[in-house]
Amino acid sequence: MAKAKSVDATWSDMKAEIAKIDTRQLVSLLADLYRFSKENQAFLHARFAVVADPLDPYKRTIAECMYPDVYKNKPVQISKAKKAISDYSKAEGDSLGEAELMTFFVERGNAFTVNFGDIDEEFYDALNRMYRRAIEKILSLPEKQRDEFKERLKTIMTSSADIGWGFHDALCEDYYSAFPEDE
């Protein structure tokens, strides 16, 4: 009698099945996955570095989510913007690219609140957490790659001076803890 298939397949099950197919079938499978979603396309573009700027689709998503078109009634979508960063990390795992996307996330969110006013505590908490994550990622980079990011982080901090919810204070605390020489 044939062994019954498990209801919950695992990666090991999938890997065993994939190992049985030839190159042509594997390419066909990847083509199907590529056509299935924009996220898959961005993942494969980043993984195989086939586009000039693998960050571009992720930055577009972050920009649309963190600085939405308010005149078209588009909402801020923090979780979708964070997912774009996570998706890039899974596709590429490049610390420099991750630092860029994290910093860009905070830049777009900060620009949105500077231009459109007070948002809510959840929004500012998300920006503060991402600012901290960006600093941690930037500090893990080689020293010569940090300077541009440091300037961008400082610009975010200084431009937030008139924003409430403790946002500016938290940015200052995080920035000067990471870069005490600037205090």
Region annotations inferred by a language model:
Residues 4-70:
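N-terminal interaction modules that seed assembly of large macromolecular complexes
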Residues 25-26, 80, 102-105, 130, ...:
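Structural recognition of alpha-solenoid helical scaffolds
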Residues 40-117:
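Long, charge-patterned amphipathic interaction tracts in eukaryotic proteins
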Residues 98, 102, 119-122, 133, ...:
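N-terminal intrinsically disordered, cationic/polar leader segments
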Residues 128-183:
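Eukaryote-biased recognition of C-terminal alpha-helical segments
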